[in-house]
């Protein structure tokens, strides 16, 4: 709570019954599901994950297939010293932030995401998570220099705000899909090419504000049953394109197991002064 700022006037926010309020009496309702919406304006349709995508994401992540990425992120947070506050930008259902907080008992976490259905889940994912609906492209409703670590897992990157909310010397971890991520499904199902920016491109784009510390890659393969493949596809951007190339029909027709490659790159950067 002490890290949050009013999205109208930037004053600190305080709990007041079922809302958060600043000294100028700007007020934001706490949803009964445990998150707060600080947005003042709407966001473009199609930006936020839908409740179907959030449900598919929660179900798929519960299989543990992406657990190696939690390990990498937790190691980054542990390496930051004795972290007290971790911000997850585009936290989705809170899976990664909750996994990190399980490992780092000293820290509290803030989940920022524009998707209310995803944040309902994030708010319940861990007792030390606070969840705020926000558009990452706007200045964040977060005080200067309060975060020990910012996580960004497959989410939009706002360099200026990463820098502003991090303390001096704080760490930024940017996770992106590696070159081989889900390559079997890209071939067999014709998925959108989900490969993220190359890590040198990420370091370059953040270079004015951050110096690169490390790039960690985690990769493994697993046999997925048809139901897991469906969830994996429906939790991401392909969910918006089920008619393209008959993707929906291909998913319906799936039976048996598919070998799938998972590959994650995590760029670790340190905030420059
Ligand atoms: C691919 S998902 C990743 C979610 C989570 N980090 C994970 O890996 O499970 C991208 C997330 O970014 C969120 N998102 C997209 N654009 C956003 C924006 N402008 N502001 C805030 N969140 C945004 C979506 O709602 C979604 O939860
Ligand atoms: Zn205010």
PLM features: residue spans?
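Conserved Class I S-adenosyl-L-methionine
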Residues: 216-273
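Class I SAM-dependent methyltransferase SAM/SAH-binding core
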Residues: 85-87, 92-139
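N-terminal auxiliary segments of SAM/dcSAM-dependent transferases
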Residues: 1-47
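A short SAM/SAH-binding and catalytic strip from SAM-dependent methyltransferases
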Residues: 147-161, 176
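A short glycine-rich, Lys/Arg-flanked "PGG" loop and its adjoining helix->strand segment in the class I
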Residues: 159-171
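Class I SAM-dependent methyltransferase Rossmann-like catalytic core
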Residues: 46-72
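A short acidic, Gly/Pro-enriched loop at the edge of an enzyme's catalytic core
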Residues: 138-149
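Conserved class I S-adenosyl-L-methionine
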Residues: 171-201
């Amino acid at each position: 709570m002490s890290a949050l700022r009013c999205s109208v006037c930037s004053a600190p926010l305080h709990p007041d019954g079922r809302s958060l309020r600043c000294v100028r009496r700007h007020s934001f309702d706490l949803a009964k599901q445990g998150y707060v919406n600080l947005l003042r304006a709407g966001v473009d349709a199609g930006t936020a994950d839908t409740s179907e995508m959030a449900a598919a994401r929660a179900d798929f992540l519960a299989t543990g297939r992406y657990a190696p990425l939690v390990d990498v992120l937790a190691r980054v947070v542990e390496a930051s010293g004795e972290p007290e506050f971790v911000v997850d930008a585009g936290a989705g259902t809170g899976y990664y932030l909750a996994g990190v907080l399980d490992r780092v008992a000293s820290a509290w976490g803030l989940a920022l995401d524009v998707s209310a259905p995803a944040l309902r889940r994030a708010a319940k994912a861990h007792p030390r998570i606070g969840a705020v609906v926000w558009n990452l492209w706007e200045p964040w409703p977060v005080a200067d220099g309060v975060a020990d670590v910012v996580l960004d897992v497959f989410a939009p990157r706002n360099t200026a705000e990463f820098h502003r909310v991090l303390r001096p010397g704080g760490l930024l971890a940017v996770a992106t899909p590696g070159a081989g991520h889900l390559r079997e499904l890209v071939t067999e199902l014709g998925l959108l090419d989900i490969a993220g920016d190359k890590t040198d491109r990420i370091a370059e784009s953040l270079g004015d504000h951050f110096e690169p510390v490390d790039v960690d890659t985690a990769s493994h393969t697993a046999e997925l049953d048809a139901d897991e493949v469906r969830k994996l596809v429906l939790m991401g951007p392909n969910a918006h394109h089920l008619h393209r190339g008959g993707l929906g029909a291909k998913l319906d027709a799936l039976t048996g197991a598919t070998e799938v490659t998972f590959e994650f790159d995590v760029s670790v950067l340190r905030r420059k002064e």
